[in-house]
A protein has these predicted regions:
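N-terminal subdomain
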Residues: 1-156, 160-163, 219-236
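Active-site and NAD+-binding cores of ADP-ribose-processing enzymes
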Residues: 131, 147, 159-162, 166-236
Length: 236
């Protein structure tokens, strides 16, 4: 019976290799990555690690009211989380901007804001919903010779909780869920320490890469297809 299971495992592995390519990234010990099970745990962790910084950020932004005219520049993080994330990320991904270079400036300011925050203090699991186009590029890159991680040129919005799939937001309708293994010292911010977000959001620095670490599988709890990825930064 054991030999029969091994045979079918071998067949499944061969099918996955053909469909998704060889796995070139590997997480040595997934158990060491902190993963939250509920909102209370996630929020307690976020407040503990980011509230002091968030208070300083708000104080500085309040002082800037005396000299900065543009309202978006006074609250760059809140502005991003409101409606400007599309335009900011379009600038970073496609170099699209308005004549006043508003979104280039916002992207620069927000990058500095994130750099001023504490680094992620420990290895961490984050989640992100993505569309089929992203998944197709992830697979295509993984099947390259040699395999290459997929780059996210924009800021990366993620959640501390897998229950992001239950949010009443358009992204929750996507069928693909990234489970991201984030290394200690990554540049990122717990957004809820600054502004109220229902999804326990972590916002990560731009120009990150994601490498596929396991073949996708169906998650019974969320009814999503899970793609486990390693976050690869260019600055550490």
């Amino acid at each position: 019976m054991k030999h029969e299971y091994k045979f079918w495992d071998w067949i499944l592995n061969m099918i996955n290799k053909q469909r998704y390519g060889e796995l070139s990234w590997y997480i040595d010990n997934k158990e060491k990555y902190l993963e939250f099970k509920n909102q209370e745990e996630a929020r307690a962790w976020g407040i503990k690690n980011y509230k002091h910084w968030a208070d300083k950020y708000k104080q500085v932004m309040q002082m800037s009211n005396m000299v900065i005219k543009g309202c978006m520049y006074k609250k760059p993080l809140e502005c991003y989380c409101g409606y400007s994330y599309r335009q900011i990320n379009e600038f970073l991904r496609y170099d699209k901007d308005n004549k006043s270079h508003t979104y280039r400036e916002l992207a620069d300011i927000l990058s500095m804001v994130l750099c001023s925050a504490p680094r992620v203090p420990q290895d961490l699991v984050l989640y992100r919903m993505v569309n089929d186009e992203f998944v197709n590029r992830l697979i295509e890159n993984n099947k390259n010779t040699p395999p290459t991680p997929i780059q996210e040129k924009g800021f990366m919005s993620t959640s501390l909780l897998k229950s992001i799939t239950n949010q009443n937001e358009p992204y929750a309708k996507e069928k693909n869920l990234l489970k991201i293994f984030v290394p200690k010292n990554t540049i990122g911010v717990y957004v809820n320490a600054v502004t109220s977000r229902s999804e326990e959001e972590m916002l990560l620095f731009p120009n990150m890469y994601l490498g596929l670490v396991s073949y996708p599988y169906n998650d019974k709890e969320t009814k999503k297809i899970v793609f486990e990825c390693e976050l690869i930064g260019i600055y550490w």
